[in-house]
């Protein structure tokens, strides 16, 4: 049925995985996410026979609820289009479902389920009371007018509003969903419900319930986590060459924070290619090109003396000490990792969700390269969403410095928890196993306590 080697799983876990494949045979991304978690939780399952007695693992891999709906909207010429919307409410053991909305042509149920499944454990690692979920639509905001995006968002929220709420399900942004889209959706929710429920969405504007540091959070948090990894190796970002794939929100603010800590970020990318800037990426120019003009990295290269744009090839061929994949799933293949290792990479930490292929992860670990999975290293975004929910509940707003300090502490704590759990289960230094074991244990123990629901 697939290339997954179930002989590496215990018989009980292999049975769970084969059931997932049998029920949803076409969901490759979801299978990959489940397999990666099951590979690492065997020692936990062995210590806790009650998990098997209560079918905890079987229940965790099955969403509590998955919604699919049509989203009709009219373009500026009056033509009607129909897109497909999704919301997977995966697990609410620890709190309201929490996870972003992705608007991209590639969106399908498999991708939303993989993201929602990862979100369960990522949210558990933050220490904040949040369950896991994810949603989105196969709509492409690129090339659309503001009015078209608004009409789509209003149609999308008209259906989604039936299923969300501050104590039920709290969506946020993701690829293709930024402050503009969150604003349009929040406005429609407020109009439909006749209530100002600030806590129903996160990633809001600062004047209407948003949090300082939310925009920066995923990128900053990634670098805070990577800095802890470097410190564990007796070093720091100071003087390091860094490559960051992507040039969206996560990549921009990871670049900014890494350079604040003394690193030189020498390359960023987008779907058109990558740019090499040996002097260090000019973050102000990158923000102007990507956030203001919504341009390409080739525009950055055209305006930045000494920068070189490369349309073909791989950004992973650029020599670096630290690699931060911040674009999309499965962007870092085995060939990319082999190039990184050949050029002496010391650390890889994920800013995107599942950007490194399973074969590439194994190659990194075999080579002794420190590697952090996204569920740990990119948890800063959802952590700060959780902080935004706290502020909304208290009808208050913290200063940037206070929120950033809380974010920093959360990332330090996630690192410590991941490392300690890996050591506890005999896999010291394995960040993948440590993160999976720590997150899974918290969710599973809570489900045991709550009974069969």
Locate predicted features.
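Adenosine-phosphate binding glycine-rich loop
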Residues: 2-33, 229, 341-453
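Flexible, glycine/charged-enriched surface loops at secondary-structure junctions
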Residues: 28-31, 49-54, 127, 164-173, ...
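Structured beta-strand/loop patches that form or line metal/cofactor-binding pockets in enzymes
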Residues: 50-81
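Glycine/serine-rich phosphate-binding loop and adjoining beta1-alpha1 elements at the start
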Residues: 104, 123-238
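General beta-strand structural signal in soluble alpha/beta enzymes
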Residues: 168-172, 196-200, 244, 267-270, ...
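Glycine-rich phosphate/diphosphate-binding loop of Rossmann-like nucleotide-binding domains
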Residues: 205, 210-317
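Rossmann-like adenosine-cofactor binding region
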Residues: 273-371, 376
């Amino acid at each position: 049925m697939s290339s997954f080697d179930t002989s590496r799983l215990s018989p009980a876990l292999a049975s769970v995985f084969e059931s997932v494949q049998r029920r949803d045979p076409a969901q490759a991304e979801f299978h990959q996410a489940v397999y990666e978690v099951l590979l690492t939780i065997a020692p936990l399952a062995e210590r806790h026979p009650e998990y098997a007695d209560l079918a905890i693992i079987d229940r965790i891999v099955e969403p509590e609820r998955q919604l699919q709906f049509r989203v009709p909207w009219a373009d500026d010429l009056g033509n009607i289009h129909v897109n497909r919307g999704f919301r997977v409410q995966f697990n609410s053991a620890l709190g309201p479902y929490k996870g972003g909305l992705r608007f991209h042509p590639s969106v399908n149920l498999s991708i939303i389920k993989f993201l929602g499944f990862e979100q369960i454990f990522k949210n558990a690692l933050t220490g904040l009371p949040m369950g896991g979920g994810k949603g989105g639509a196969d709509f492409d905001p690129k090339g659309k007018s503001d009015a078209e995006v608004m009409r789509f968002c209003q149609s999308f929220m008209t259906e989604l509003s039936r299923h969300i709420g501050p104590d039920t399900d709290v969506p946020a942004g993701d690829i293709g969903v930024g402050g503009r889209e969150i604003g349009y959706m929040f406005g429609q929710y407020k109009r439909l419900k006749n209530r100002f429920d600030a806590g129903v969405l996160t990633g809001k504007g600062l004047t209407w319930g948003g949090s300082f540091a939310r925009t920066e959070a995923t990128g900053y948090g990634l670098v805070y986590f990577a800095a802890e990894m470097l410190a564990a190796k007796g070093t720091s970002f100071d003087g390091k060459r860094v490559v960051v794939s992507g040039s969206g929100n996560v990549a921009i603010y990871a670049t900014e924070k890494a350079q604040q800590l003394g690193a030189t970020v020498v390359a960023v990318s987008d779907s058109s290619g990558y740019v090499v800037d040996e002097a260090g990426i000019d973050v102000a120019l990158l923000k102007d090109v990507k956030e203001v003009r919504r341009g390409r990295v080739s525009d950055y290269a055209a305006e930045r003396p000494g920068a070189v744009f490369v349309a073909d090839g791989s950004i992973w061929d650029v020599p670096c000490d630290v690699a931060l994949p911040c674009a999309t799933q499965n962007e870092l293949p085995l060939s990319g990792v082999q190039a990184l290792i050949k050029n002496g990479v010391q650390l890889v930490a994920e800013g995107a969700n599942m950007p490194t292929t399973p074969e590439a992860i194994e190659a990194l670990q075999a080579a002794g390269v420190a590697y952090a999975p996204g569920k740990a290293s990119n948890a800063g975004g959802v952590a700060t969403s959780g902080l935004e929910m706290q502020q909304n509940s208290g009808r208050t707003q913290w200063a940037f410095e206070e929120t950033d300090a809380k974010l920093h502490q959360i990332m330090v704590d996630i690192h410590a928890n991941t490392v300690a759990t890996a050591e506890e289960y005999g896999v010291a230094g394995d960040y993948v196993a440590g993160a999976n074991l720590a997150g899974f244990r918290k969710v599973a123990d809570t489900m045991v306590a709550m009974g069969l629901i």
